[in-house]
C-alpha cells in the first residue's frame, strides 16, 4: 500500500463498510456479498469491489465475503486494531461536544487530555475530563504517547496550537478551525470546516 496513493474517498468508504460489517457481525450474519454491502451503504457493488481491491483479494466468487474476516481486515487497514490516544485543545462549545461523543471510544480513540487558556475554564470538568492549562499540553502528549491532536479553538489561535502539538510529537491533527495550518509534511492534517460542507449542500440544492 505504500507504493501508491489510496484515494481519500476510498478510505472514507472503507470506514463506512467497517461500520456496516460490525452491524452484521453483531446480528450473527456470517457471509455478505458486495451487492449487500453496496445496498447497505448506498454505493454500487462495483465500487465496493474496486475499493477492497486496493488492499488485496477478499471473498470467494459465488459465495461472498466472510463477515468476521472482512471486518478484521478493514479494521486493520484503518489502524483500528490498535487504540489511539488523543488530546482536545479548546474547551468551548465544540470541544465540549467532542468530549461528550461516545463514538470515539467505540472505535478505539481515547481522549487523555482537554486543554484551554481561559482561566475561567481551567480546572472545571467536561464530562469526566478536567480542563487543563495549555502549558501542560506537551507534558501530557509525551507522557501518554498521544499521536492525534484535535484543534477546537478559534482560527486566530489554531496555528499556535498546531505548532505546539507538532513540537510535542503528535503525528496527526484533526482541525475544526476554519483556517489552513502550516505543519511539516510528516504530520497529517484533516480539516473539518462546517461552513464548507454547508456550502457544498447549498450548491447541490441549487443545481437540482
UniProtKB/Swiss-Prot annotation:
Disulphide bond pairs: none
Binding site for NAD(+): 90-95
Superkingdom: Bacteria
Gene3D superfamilies tied to this protein: NAD(P)-binding Rossmann-like Domain, Winged helix-like DNA-binding domain superfamily/Winged helix DNA-binding domain
Residue ranges of DNA binding: 16-55
The keyword Repressor is assigned to this record: yes
Biological processes, Gene Ontology terms: negative regulation of DNA-templated transcription; response to redox state
InterPro entries, per the entry: CoA-bd, NAD(P)-bd_dom_sf, Rex_DNA-bd_C_dom, Tscrpt_rep_Rex, WH-like_DNA-bd_sf, WH_DNA-bd_sf
Subcellular compartments: Cytoplasm
UniProt-recorded Gene Ontology molecular function terms: DNA binding; DNA-binding transcription factor activity
GO cellular component, one term: cytoplasm
Alphabetically ordered keywords of this record: Cytoplasm, DNA-binding, NAD, Repressor, Transcription, Transcription regulation
Record-stated family: Belongs to the transcriptional regulatory Rex family.
HAMAP family per the UniProt record, alphabetical: Rex
Subunit structure: Homodimer.
Protein purpose: Modulates transcription in response to changes in cellular NADH/NAD(+) redox state.
Protein name: Redox-sensing transcriptional repressor Rex
Amino acid at each position: 500500500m505504500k507504493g501508491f496513493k489510496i484515494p481519500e474517498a476510498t478510505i472514507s468508504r472503507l470506514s463506512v463498510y467497517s461500520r456496516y460489517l460490525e452491524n452484521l457481525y453483531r446480528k450473527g450474519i456470517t457471509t455478505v456479498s458486495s451487492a449487500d454491502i453496496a445496498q447497505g451503504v448506498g454505493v454500487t457493488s462495483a465500487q465496493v469491489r474496486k475499493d477492497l481491491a486496493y488492499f488485496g483479494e477478499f471473498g470467494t466468487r459465488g459465495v461472498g465475503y466472510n463477515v468476521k474476516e472482512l471486518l478484521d481486515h478493514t479494521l486493520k487497514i484503518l489502524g483500528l486494531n490498535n487504540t489511539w490516544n488523543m488530546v482536545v485543545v479548546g474547551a468551548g462549545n465544540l470541544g465540549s461536544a467532542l468530549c461528550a461523543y461516545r463514538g470515539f471510544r467505540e472505535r478505539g480513540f481515547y481522549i487523555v487530555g482537554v486543554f484551554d487558556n481561559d482561566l475561567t475554564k481551567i480546572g472545571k470538568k467536561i464530562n469526566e475530563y478536567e480542563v487543563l492549562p495549555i502549558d501542560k499540553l506537551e507534558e501530557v502528549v509525551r507522557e501518554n504517547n498521544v499521536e492525534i491532536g484535535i484543534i477546537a479553538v478559534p482560527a486566530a489561535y489554531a496555528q499556535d496550537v498546531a505548532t505546539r502539538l507538532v513540537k510535542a510529537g503528535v503525528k496527526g491533527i484533526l482541525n475544526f478551525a476554519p483556517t489552513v495550518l502550516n505543519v511539516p509534511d510528516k504530520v497529517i492534517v484533516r480539516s473539518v470546516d462546517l461552513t464548507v460542507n454547508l456550502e457544498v449542500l447549498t450548491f447541490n440544492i441549487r443545481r437540482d
